[in-house]
Swiss-Prot record:
Chief location of this protein within or outside the cell: membrane
Organism: Pseudomonas fluorescens (strain Pf0-1)
Protein name as it appears in the record: LPS-assembly protein LptD
Signal peptide: 1-33
Gene3D superfamilies in the cross-refs: Lipopolysaccharide (LPS) transport protein A like domain
Cellular compartments per GO CC: cell outer membrane; transporter complex
C-alpha cells in the first residue's frame, strides 16, 4: 500500500496499519489474512479501503523481546515457537573476518555478485583481480532524494494482524517497509504504535544511500529511521567496504556505529586484512570513519595497534592523519613520517609532514595549497636543527637547515597571466642530505627563483620576468640571473598580398656574483672554487637589447607549400667586466702570441652590437597513393622537403655568452634558421637541407609507420662558434655535408611502438649519435609494460666547468695524469631495460637495468615482485643505484654505489603502510608506470 503521510506521521508513521485494523470488530483480538484490506487516503482525508486478496495462513506471531515493554506495560506473549527451540544462529565473531556463509553460501546476502555474472558495464568498474563486486539490486526509491518527512510510506507483507489493546501490529512473510530512499526488510516484524518502534526478526536488511546492514534481529525507531541491528554485517557498495559487528547502530543522519566491529575492503571470502576496533563510526556524509582501540589484523593476526585512527571511506578529502612512511637511509638513519592533512575549505588545504630522522632529528615540513577561480598555487616550508655533524667543516654548510617555496599560476583577467616559482634553501647540500620532495620541490642542480607577468593582446604578447637561481650543488659554477627581462613579441594585424610581419623584442639584464676564494671539502681538504675557472670575457655582466623583425610569405596548396622568409637580428650590449677578467684576457693574448697560436677568447668592449640578416626558403611537396601491405589497405605518403638558409658571417667573439648553447644535431636541425639557442650567437650558414618523410596511414587514420631521412649540403665553413672553440680545429665546422639524420617510428599495433634516431657522419664514417626504443603497454591491459632502449652520443657541445671553456665531443673529465681524471666522462653509451609483467594472476615481476658501457658500470638495477588483489598490494624490490653525495667539487668522486631492499604495502581503502620511496623510483625509472597506476582499480 502507498500512503501519503498524514499530519500525525511524525509520531508514528505506521499508524496506517493500526487505522486499517482498528476498523475490524472489537471482539476480535486479531485479524487473519483473509480479513485484510488495502487502504489509501481519500480525497476527504479519510481512509478508502477494499478487501485484500486472501493470503496464506498467518504464521504465529513473533515473540516480543523480553527486554522491550510496550506502552501498555504488557508482558510479552508466550509462544510455543521460541528462538531457543530453533538452531542457534552463527555469530559474526566466528567468521574471522569473512562473510557469514550460514546466511548464504555465495554471499548474496551482502549483494555480492560473482565476476562471471557481472554485466559488461559492471566489469569495466571492477578490478582485474577481483572475483566479483557488490551490486545493489534495483529497487523502488533507491535514488529517491525526497526529504523523509515529505516522503510516503510503503508497507508490504504476506500476512498481518493487529492487537488493539496493546496497539501492536504484526507482519509476517517478506516484510518490506520503505520510505524515501530507505528500505527495511525482514521475515517478521512487530510494530509498537505507542513507542513508534518496530522489532524485526529473521534475515533483517536495512538499505539506504548505497549502504546495506544485515542482521538476525533489529530494533527500528519508526519516526526517525534509527536502528540497531544485532549480529550485523554491513556493505558500502561503491567503496567496496564491508565488515561486521556485535551490533550496528544506524543514526537518523545515516551514520553507522559498530560495536566490536571490523572494517575491510577485502572480498567476502577473505580476511587478508581488517581493522578491528571496540567502536567504529562510519560517516557517509563526510566520507570518513573513526575507530578506537584498533588493531590491524593480517590473516586474523594482529600486527599493529593504535588507540585511535581516522580513515577515508570514499574519495572525499577530510582532515586527519595520512598513512605513515617508514624507512632507512645512510644519510638519515631510521626515518618515520606521520603526515597530517587539514581540509580547511573546498578550495584550500594544508598538510604537515613531521619527519623524524634518527641521525638528524625532527624535520618539520608543511604545505598550503589554494585554488581560486583565476589562480592556483601552494606555499611550502621546512626546518631542521641538524644533529649530524659530518659536514661541519664543509664550505656553505648550515646547521639550521631550511627551505621555503611559493608556486603560483593565475590570471588577473582574461589577458593578464601571473606566475611565481620561488624556492630558497639554506645550503647546497639540502636535497642530498634530507632526501625530501614532500612539498613539491624536486632536487636539482639549481632551484628556481622566478616571477613573471604576461599580457596577451590580440596580436602580441608582452612579458615582464625576473628570474634568479640558487645553486643546490657545489660542483657547478654560478649561473646568470635575469633581473629583469622584458619581452614584446607579436605579428602585425594586416597582411598585404598575404605577407606576414612578425617581430621579437627583448631587453634583459644578466648578472651574477662569482664566488672567489677556496672551498673546504668534507674531510677538510682545501680546493679552489669552481667559479675561479670562469675566466676572461666569461666573467662579464651586462644588458642586452635584441630586436628581430621578420617578413614571410606562406603559400600553401593541396600538393605542397612554399615559405620564403627574411629576418634581421640586431643585438646591442652594454657590458661590465671586473679587473680579474680584464687581466686574464691580456694574459691569454700574450700566451697565444708567445706560442704562435690563434687567440679565440675575444676582447672586452663595454659596448658591443651585432646585426645579421637571415634569409631562408622552405618548401615541400606532398604525394600519396593507396596501397596494400600484407593484405591491409594503406595510404602511403611521400613528402620531400627543401630548405635553403643563408646567414652571412659576423664576428661575434667579443660578445659573451649569457644564455646560449648549441643545439644537439638531429633531423629537426636541418630546418632550423639558427644552430644556437638564445640570442648571443647567430650561426653563419650557407646551406641547402634535403629531407623526405614517408608515412603509412591506415583507413582509420592510424599511422603505422613513419621514416624521415635527410642531410644538409654546406657551401661555406661555419666560422661562428662558442667561446673556446676554434673553427679551424673543429672537424664538422669545415665539412661540406652534415651527418645523415634518420628518424623512424613503427607501431606494430596500438600497443607496441618502436622509435629510433640515428646520425651517421660520412666524413669519419662513424655514428655521432643514435637511440632506439621499444615500448609496449596494451591499452586494454596497462599492467603489462616493456621498455628496451639504447642510446649513444659523442657529439655534445658543453661547457667545461674545470677549464672555463666550451668543448666539442664526449669529452674527458679533468686533465690526463691529474687526480680525478676520467676518460670519456661525458660520452653516453647506455642501455636501459625495464619491465612490469604479470606472471600468474595477481603476481607481477618488476625489473630495471640501466648500464653504462662507457664506464663499465651499472647505473641502476632493481628486481622484485608485486602482489595485487582486490584489497591489498605488496611490492618487494631489491635495488642498486649510483647515488650522488657531494663531499667535494669533483663530480665523479661524489658518485658512489648504494644498495637497498624496499618494501611497499598498500591496504586499499586505508592507504599505504610503508614504501613511498618505491613509488618514486618506479615512476622515474619505468616509462608507462604512471599510466599503469592511474588506470589501476
Amino acid at each position: 500500500m502507498a500512503l501519503k503521510s498524514p499530519a500525525f506521521r511524525k509520531k508514528f508513521p505506521l499508524l496506517v496499519t493500526g487505522s486499517l485494523l482498528a476498523m475490524q470488530p472489537l471482539a476480535s483480538s486479531f485479524v487473519v489474512a483473509a480479513e485484510q484490506y488495502d487502504c489509501a487516503v481519500s480525497a476527504t482525508g479519510g481512509w478508502a479501503c477494499s478487501p485484500k486478496t486472501p493470503a496464506a495462513a498467518l504464521p504465529p506471531r513473533p515473540v516480543h523481546d523480553g527486554s522491550a515493554v510496550s506502552a501498555a506495560g504488557e508482558a510479552p506473549a508466550e509462544s510455543g515457537s521460541t528462538a531457543e527451540s530453533g538452531p542457534k544462529p552463527v555469530l559474526v565473531t566466528e567468521s574471522k573476518g569473512r562473510g557469514l556463509k550460514s546466511r548464504s553460501e555465495d554471499y548474496s546476502h551482502l549483494d555480492w555478485v560473482p565476476r562471471e555474472k557481472l554485466t559488461a558495464a559492471q566489469l569495466a568498474e571492477t578490478g582485474p583481480y577481483c572475483s566479483g563486486s557488490y551490486i545493489e539490486p534495483i529497487r523502488p526509491g533507491m535514488n529517491d532524494k525526497t526529504n523523509k518527512s515529505d516522503a510516503p510510506t510503503f508497507i508490504g507483507a504476506k500476512a498481518s494482524r493487529y492487537q488493539q489493546d496493546s496497539q501492536v501490529a504484526s507482519l509476517a512473510g517478506d516484510v518490506v517497509m520503505r520510505q524515501g530512499s530507505m528500505q527495511v526488510e525482514a521475515d517478521e516484524a512487530n510494530l509498537y504504535q505507542a513507542e513508534s518502534r518496530g522489532e524485526l526478526a529473521g534475515n533483517v536488511r536495512i538499505r539506504d544511500n548505497g549502504a546495506l546492514i544485515v542482521g538476525d534481529h533489529a530494533d527500528v525507531q519508526l519516526d526517525t529511521g534509527e536502528a540497531k541491528v544485532d549480529n550485523a554485517e554491513y556493505v558500502m557498495h561503491k567503496s567496496r567496504i564491508r565488515g561486521n559487528a556485535l551490533y550496528a547502530k544506524r543514526a537518523e543522519n545515516a551514520i553507522i556505529r559498530l560495536k566490536d566491529g571490523t572494517y575491510t575492503t577485502c572480498e567476502p571470502n577473505s580476511n587478508a586484512w581488517q581493522l578491528k576496533g571496540n567502536n567504529i563510526t562510519l560517516n557517509p556524509a563526510t566520507g570518513f570513519g573513526t575507530a578506537t582501540n584498533v588493531t590491524l589484523r593480517v590473516k586474523d593476526i594482529p600486527v599493529l595497534y593504535t588507540p585511535y585512527i581516522y580513515f577515508p571511506i570514499d574519495d572525499r578529502r577530510q582532515s586527519g592523519f595520512l598513512p605513515p612512511t617508514i624507512g632507512t637511509g645512510s644519510d638519515t638513519g631510521f626515518m618515520l613520517v606521520t603526515p597530517y592533512y587539514f581540509n580547511l575549505a573546498p578550495n584550500y588545504d594544508a598538510t604537515l609532514y613531521p619527519r623524524y630522522m634518527a641521525k638528524r632529528g625532527l624535520l618539520m615540513e608543511g604545505e598550503f595549497r589554494y585554488l581560486t577561480k583565476s589562480s592556483e598555487g601552494q606555499f611550502g616550508a621546512a626546518f631542521l636543527n641538524d644533529e649530524e655533524t659530518e659536514r661541519s667543516k664543509q664550505t656553505d654548510y648550515q646547521k639550521n637547515r631550511y627551505m621555503y617555496n611559493w608556486q603560483h599560476k593565475g590570471g588577473l583577467d582574461s589577458r593578464v597571466f601571473t606566475q611565481v616559482d620561488y624556492t630558497k634553501i639554506s645550503d647546497p647540500y639540502y636535497f642530498q642530505d634530507l632526501q625530501t620532495d614532500q612539498i613539491g620541490v624536486k632536487s636539482a642542480d639549481f632551484v628556481n627563483q622566478q616571477g613573471s607577468v604576461t599580457y596577451r593582446g590580440d596580436n602580441y604578447t608582452a612579458r615582464l620576468n625576473a628570474q634568479a637561481y640558487q645553486l643546490a650543488t657545489v660542483s657547478n659554477i654560478t649561473p646568470y640571473d635575469r633581473l629583469p627581462q622584458i619581452t614584446f613579441n607579436g605579428q602585425l594585424p594586416y597582411h598585404p598580398e598575404g605577407l606576414n610581419f612578425d617581430y621579437e623584442t627583448e631587453v634583459v639584464r644578466f648578472d651574477r656574483d662569482l664566488q672567489n676564494g677556496n672551498f673546504v671539502n668534507e674531510d677538510g681538504t682545501v680546493e679552489r672554487r669552481l667559479d675561479n675557472n670562469v675566466i676572461g670575457l666569461a666573467r662579464a655582466n651586462g644588458d642586452r637589447l635584441n630586436l628581430k623583425p621578420s617578413v614571410s610569405l606562406p603559400l600553401n596548396w593541396t600538393y605542397g607549400f612554399l615559405k620564403p622568409s627574411l629576418k634581421y637580428q640586431y643585438t646591442q650590449y652594454q657590458l661590465d667586466l671586473d679587473g680579474t677578467g680584464k687581466s686574464q684576457i691580456v694574459a691569454q693574448q700574450n700566451a697565444a702570441a708567445a706560442t704562435g697560436t690563434r687567440y679565440v677568447g675575444g676582447e672586452f668592449g663595454s659596448s658591443q652590437n651585432r646585426g645579421v640578416p637571415i634569409a631562408s626558403i622552405d618548401g615541400g611537396l606532398y604525394f600519396d597513393r593507396n596501397t596494400t601491405w600484407f593484405g591491409k589497405n594503406y595510404r602511403q605518403t611521400l613528402e620531400p622537403r627543401l630548405f635553403y638558409l643563408y646567414v652571412p658571417e659576423k664576428d661575434q667573439e667579443d660578445i659573451p655568452v649569457f644564455d646560449t648553447s648549441e643545439y644537439t644535431f638531429n633531423y629537426a636541425s636541418l630546418f632550423r634558421d639558427n644552430r644556437f639557442s638564445g640570442s648571443d650567437r647567430v650561426g653563419d650558414e650557407n646551406k641547402l637541407s634535403l629531407g623526405i618523410d614517408n608515412r603509412w596511414i591506415e583507413e582509420d587514420g592510424f599511422e603505422r609507420q613513419r621514416i624521415s631521412i635527410g642531410q644538409a649540403l654546406y657551401f661555406k665553413d661555419r666560422e661562428v662558434q662558442l667561446p673556446g672553440i676554434d673553427p679551424k680545429t673543429r672537424d664538422d665546422a669545415h665539412s661540406n655535408v652534415s651527418p645523415y639524420a634518420l628518424e623512424y617510428e613503427y607501431r606494430w599495433n596500438r600497443d607496441w611502438r618502436t622509435t629510433a634516431d640515428y646520425n651517421w657522419d660520412p666524413d669519419s664514417r662513424s655514428p655521432r649519435s643514435g637511440s632506439a626504443m621499444l615500448h609496449y603497454q596494451p591499452e586494454d591491459n596497462p599492467n603489462k609494460v616493456v621498455n628496451v632502449g639504447y642510446r649513444y652520443r659523442n657529439d655534445q657541445v658543453r661547457y667545461d666547468q674545470n677549464t672555463g671553456k666550451w668543448s666539442v665531443g664526449g669529452g674527458d673529465y679533468g686533465t690526463p695524469g691529474q687526480p680525478g681524471y676520467v676518460k670519456d666522462y661525458y660520452k653516453i653509451q647506455q642501455h636501459d631495460f625495464s619491465v612490469i609483467w604479470p606472471i600468474v594472476p595477481q603476481w607481477s615481476a618488476i625489473s630495471r637495468w640501466q648500464y653504462d658501457y662507457n664506464r663499465n658500470r651499472t647505473l641502476e638495477a632493481f628486481g622484485g615482485f608485486e602482489y595485487d588483489n582486490c584489497c591489498w598490494k605488496l611490492r618487494l624490490i631489491n635495488r642498486y643505484w649510483v647515488s650522488y653525495d657531494e663531499f667535494s667539487q669533483n663530480a665523479p668522486e661524489n658518485e658512489k654505489g648504494d644498495h637497498g631492499v624496499f618494501l611497499q604495502i598498500v591496504l586499499k581503502g586505508l592507504g599505504g603502510l610503508t614504501g613511498a620511496k618505491v613509488e618514486s623510483f618506479l615512476d622515474k625509472g619505468i616509462q608507462g608506470y604512471r599510466q599503469r597506476e592511474d588506470q589501476a582499480f
